[in-house]
Amino acid sequence: MRLGRCLAIGTFGELSGRKMLVKSETSAVDRLPGIDLYDLIGEMFPINRSLTGAGVRKTLGIVGRHIDLDIHEVATGTAVLDWHVPMEWNIRSATIKTLDGKCLVDFAENNLHVMGYSKPVNGVFGRAELARRVHTLPDQPDLIPYRTGYYADDWGFCLPHSLWQGMNDEHYRVDIDSDLSPGSMTYGEFLVPGETRREVLITCHVCHPSLANDNLSGVAIMTALAMRQSERRGRLGYRFLFLPATIGAITWLARNEAMLDRIEHGLVLTCLGDSGPFHYKQSRKGATIDRAAAHVLKHCGEPHEIMPFNPYGYDERQFCSPGFDLPVGCLMRGVHGTFPEYHTSADNMDFVKPEALVRSYSAIEALLDLLDGNCTYQRGDGRGEPQLGRRGLYRAIAGQREAGGATQMDLLWFLNLADGQHSLLDMAIRADVPFARLEAAARLALDAGLVRLVAAA
């Protein structure tokens, strides 16, 4: 059950709908995802994905078993802002063998072995020539790096440095059975309509191959969130985008400029399955989503860090570009490029932890409830404190919980700040208590006829 809901605000700001006075406290069970996140990641992990191609379609097909996903295909060459949709890439096999037929590197064993978007090749190459197309990690000699060449007419292999150091033959037979041809780029979209036209935009990238944290963790968590939101009617709509990184976000923005004024809040999800602390990267201009995320993380019981916006990272770069400047932040645990498993074969099913996935899901669920329930109230008569005792709202023992889940102090904070100027989030931040407790206090005061709803924040 949701934490609560304001009166709906119509398209032009008028109040509409009826009060929804629902239970304010949420049990631990309510914060559990409706699917096994770790198992879902495990199902998607073996699939080879890139900006385009069969792997993305297969992945979105798995997501589509859980939500009614709209699949969009955008043709190769389509102009999108300053870019064009690239050629479609598909790969069937790739190997490096000795001349006597011994297979040393096989794409079938790990899809990180081939540089993404490698063009087809078949021939015998000298070691020196092959060295220019081999990517390794000398500081992590047993790991396979993840590399791409999306917009380069090139090919390459990625392998453990220890393996490469032992490859001392003069020549090797190389085969990459791939094709780059006109086709399309695929992305998925799922909209849960709200009572108003205003929306929360939630996105993740779906273009990485067998990397569990970056970003199958985001794909799985976003799928579970979409399932959860589809089962409830909120004040806000929720638009979930499963996109190839960069070009996918740019394409969606180019095709949807006319509706961007609906986006009230936005969140990019990535790297949410490791055991590290939460990191929230703020939007470019500062927005309610930034304050809301900081508040939820402060009260979630886990270490966290708030990071200022910078123009490098994930698709928040596109949503926050100056021509759009949407209120979109990014939530992650491990920050790109800062943990040793990043973009290596160590980002595997052992690296992501089921408990971290569930805690990430729970924090985001609380954030969505906050955004949907963030309203502004005003006292009917703000002169002095109202008499709580005759309304059954007074407790002589300091700190004792009222029936609706708020303490007496929560109720006093709410009644003092219910001046038509402070939203529930403003109140929760100032009182330094979880949002749900101020929302519970609002429900009690509204039930008692002490306040009226002024606006939904």
Give residue spans per PLM region.
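N-terminal hydrophobic/helix-forming segments and targeting peptides
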Residues: 6, 12-457
